[in-house]
Each structure stands twice: as C-alpha cells, then as structure tokens.
Amino acid sequence: MALPVNKRVPKILFILFVVAFCVYLVPRVAINFFYYPDDKIYGPDPWSAESVEFTAKDGTRLQGWFIPSSTGPADNAIATIIHAHGNAGNMSAHWPLVSWLPERNFNVFMFDYRGFGKSKGTPSQAGLLDDTQSAINVVRHRSDVNPQRLVLFGQSIGGANILAVIGQGDREGIRAVILDSTFASYATIANQMIPGSGYLLDESYSGENYIASVSPIPLLLIHGKADHVIPWQHSEKLYSLAKEPKRLILIPDGEHIDAFSDRHGDVYREQMVNFILSALNPQN
C-alpha cells in the first residue's frame, strides 16, 4: 500500500538530505586521504634560514624559509631556487634534499603549503596552487634576490603545483623548471591510492594539461624507475607532452624523490646544477 503524500514527503526529503550530505562529504574525506601534512619537527632549522611569514591570495597565513647562498651575498647568487615540496611532512622533512644548494651559490626559498608545518588552513588543490603562486611572488619582491634569475623546483605534488602556476601564465623571471618524481594526472594517482576515487579530484589542476606551456623555459624531468609511490611512466608521459627545450633523466635504482639525497651523492646534483647553468646561459 502506497504511503500517503504527507508521509512520503519527509522520507523523500530525508533521502535527498543524505544524498546531498554524501556529495558534500565524500570529496572532503578523499582529500584528507590524499594529503599527508603534519607539524612534526624533523630536524633543526637551517642555521642561516630567515623565517618568512606571508599570506596567500585568499588570506591564508603561510610559513617559509629563505636560505641565502653560503658562498657570498644573496644578491650575487647564481639564481634563487623556489622549492615546492612533496605531499607529506613539511619543509623541515624536505630540507635535506635541497641543503646542498646554498654551498653551490644558490639561494633557496622553501615554504609549507596550507595545513603543513606552521602554515594555517586546510590543503586543497586550489589552495596549494594559490600557495605556490604566492610563494613565487614573495621571492620576486625581495630586495636581495635577482627577480630575473628564478628556478622552480617541484618534487612530487610540488611539481604539479608548479606546472599549474605556469599554466596560469605566471612566467616572469623563471629561467628553468625542474620536476622530480611528479605525476601527470591527479585522477590516476588518486585511483592508485583509493580505487575509484579519481573522479573526486579536479583534473583541471593536473600537470599534463600545462606541461606544453613551459616552453621555451628549459625543462628538466627526473624520476626513479624504482619509485613505488609515483610510477616513473608519469614523467615519461609528461616528457612526451612537453615541448623543447626539455630533458628527461631516469634513474635505474631511483626511489621516490631521492635523486638529490645522499644515497646518490653528487651524481644528479651536478647534473641539475649544469642544467641550470645552461638554462641561464643558453649561448654557451
């Protein structure tokens, strides 16, 4: 027997409420599984680091470090490298991967995305893009930095954020782009982590959409073939979509974002430095 109309309406409204709640909640739960921020201190701050507090365009308060060249004044550095770190921990965990750069006469600017380390807010695709773009602008406006000699260095998800920034047309002063262990597609990686969850992430932020727009800025991609977090084929795909000038380095025994760790010594560090020098002096 059919329910009277006055009894069916509350039931229908309840079902609609549950559906709407799931539509609202499920993507947010998926995002929480996708990002792995924490505020643990993994090591001491770099002794020469200047703590930098800045604000993203949407008002979120963020934390960064400016580490000047250790071989001379910051304004005489070869270039300033803006580092966008990976998807776990915070910049104190990632500092060892770039700690070798100041002694080679590079300034380094590191920062934590919203929700990571001491930065406020909650991670999101749009938020991390905002944070990365805001960090680049902070460096551009420093009086001790040559704003025409900037290098973007993104590891893992940091590379995706850098590509999205480039895709927004933000190119002023950027002389080289370096991507380490970066994925081509958010959906593909999300499905790898949680099967079927890829549709919950916005593919418009995926690096494969923007990699071609990096040119004519020189592009270096590097990836370990033993990477069990992001398969190396992602970098191979990005390389195939990119335009010249471009270079791809595949490390036979390389793991996730370990190309510049002590495990490989100076092998890939020197290749990165030589790539930057070539990008800054293309006539040589």
Curated annotation (Swiss-Prot):
Organism whose genome encodes this protein: Escherichia coli O157:H7
Record bears the keyword Isomerase: no
Key words, A-Z: Membrane, Transmembrane, Transmembrane helix
SUPFAM superfamilies the record matches: alpha/beta-Hydrolases (SSF53474)
Sequence intervals crossing the membrane: 12-32
Protein name: Uncharacterized protein YfhR
Main subcellular location: membrane
Family named by the database record: Belongs to the serine esterase family.
Topology relative to the membrane: Single-pass membrane protein
Gene it is expressed from: yhfR
GO CC entries: membrane
Subcellular locations according to the entry: Membrane
